[in-house]
């Protein structure tokens, strides 16, 4: 049976999370929330024989666990799935090279028509996965964008990150996406994107290795070359947040600013290929890259508790940015001035994210409602 979807799982010291993630790929004939919990429990206890697998779907799915030099029992956890479902689960071992390196290696091994990356500490909605495999079997677009949801472990709360398009049965280009930006932006991310394997491999693009934040690169540069894109409303990916040990925590982000800077300048190399991008590709690239640079400003100027140091870091960054890309430097100046003002006023990151950012989101929703009303 040919594979329809390949899931790449970059894995490094994820022993305590991996079982939940891998068990979420066990599509059963009766797939609901209760079944998913049962599957996770059975897998934890090694009682795979009690899981009522939908073989027709599992035969079309490939799950590649890329062992990025892990030092814990992650491989042992994954091996149990390989032993029971050798036609679906596979382990690829490599020396440690970071998240981007693990994705690059995973791409070399995919056999599916489409590929998606799911982090080892996250999981998927199993019923949505079943629907996705069935859907991908009948489309050929360069990329698919799917709604996802956040799970905040500190609050035990889910929050949707949904996309909205006029017709979920239709196919869109990047110019369309730019025109629908606020309605689809949440899905234009690492957690929302699914690539056609043939399209992705033909680009020959390699993600930055030995750094954090290359997920921004993954969702930006290859996607800027997509000629055809489809959207799925049902939420698939469950993105776990709220863990102070995660790389997305404020302290970790400040510490890893040099990584983000390296990724930004690697992304900017794609400017040399604007002529190869399809209609709307350049505009998409500018908007997405502006967002990445804006996140750099937020981390350095707002999340960094040493405000003076943050200003000095950004001044050096802006000098390099102006030299590298006058286009992107001009594109982000208004946002930079806002963040610099917030820095001077000692606006906290919690205020920015809980108050100011919410006002911006409300404005977007009002605009979205107005557009729907005018139709």
Model-derived features with residue positions:
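Glycine-rich, basic loop-to-helix element that forms the pyrophosphate-binding segment
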Residues: 94-110
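Short, well-formed alpha-helical segments that are part of the catalytic scaffolds
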Residues: 14-52
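Short beta-strand/loop segment that forms part of the nucleotide-sugar
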Residues: 35-42, 48, 53-55, 60-70, ...
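Short aromatic/hydrophobic "clamp" motif used to bind/position activated sugar donors
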Residues: 115
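Membrane-interface aromatic/basic loop that binds lipid-linked glycans or pyrophosphate carriers
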Residues: 141, 302-375
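Donor-binding/catalytic cores of nucleotide-activated saccharide
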Residues: 99, 103, 120-230, 237-255
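A conserved acidic beta->alpha catalytic loop
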Residues: 24, 31, 67-76, 98
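Cell-envelope/extracellular polymer assembly enzymes that use nucleotide-activated donors
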Residues: 3-6, 62, 217
């Amino acid at each position: 049976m040919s594979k329809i979807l390949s899931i790449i799982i970059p894995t490094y010291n994820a022993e305590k999370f991996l079982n939940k993630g891998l068990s979420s790929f066990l599509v059963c004939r009766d797939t609901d929330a209760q079944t998913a919990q049962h599957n996770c429990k059975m897998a934890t206890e090694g009682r795979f024989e009690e899981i009522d697998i939908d073989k027709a779907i599992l035969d079309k799915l490939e799950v590649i666990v890329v062992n990025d030099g892990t030092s814990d029992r992650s491989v042992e956890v994954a091996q149990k799935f390989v032993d029971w479902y050798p036609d679906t689960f596979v382990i690829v071992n490599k020396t440690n090279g970071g998240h981007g390196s693990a994705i690059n290696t995973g791409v070399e091994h995919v056999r599916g028509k489409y590929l998606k990356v799911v982090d080892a500490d996250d999981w998927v909605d199993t019923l949505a996965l079943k629907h996705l495999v069935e859907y991908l079997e009948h489309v050929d677009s360069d990329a698919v964008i799917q709604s996802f949801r956040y799970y905040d472990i500190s609050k035990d709360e889910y929050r949707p990150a949904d996309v909205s398009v006029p017709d979920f049965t239709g196919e869109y280009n990047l110019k369309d996406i730019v025109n629908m930006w606020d309605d689809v932006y949440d899905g234009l991310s690492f957690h929302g994107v699914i690539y056609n394997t043939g399209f992705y491999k033909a680009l020959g693009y390699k993600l930055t290795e030995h750094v954090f934040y290359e997920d921004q690169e993954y969702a930006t540069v290859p996607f800027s070359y997509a000629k055809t894109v489809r959207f799925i409303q049902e939420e698939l990916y469950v993105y776990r947040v709220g863990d102070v040990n995660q790389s997305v925590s404020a302290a970790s982000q400040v510490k890893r600013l040099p990584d983000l800077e390296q990724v930004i300048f690697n992304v900017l190399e794609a400017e040399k290929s604007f002529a190869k991008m399809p209609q709307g590709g350049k505009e998409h690239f500018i908007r997405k890259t502006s967002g990445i640079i804006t996140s750099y400003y937020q981390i350095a100027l707002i999340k960094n508790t040493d405000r003076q140091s943050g200003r000095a870091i950004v001044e050096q960054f802006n000098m390099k940015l102006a030299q590298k890309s006058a286009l992107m430097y001009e594109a982000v100046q208004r946002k930079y001035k806002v963040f610099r003002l917030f820095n001077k006023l000692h606006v906290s990151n919690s205020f920015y994210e809980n108050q100011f950012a919410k006002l911006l989101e409300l404005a977007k929703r009002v605009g979205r409602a107005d557009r729907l009303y005018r139709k």
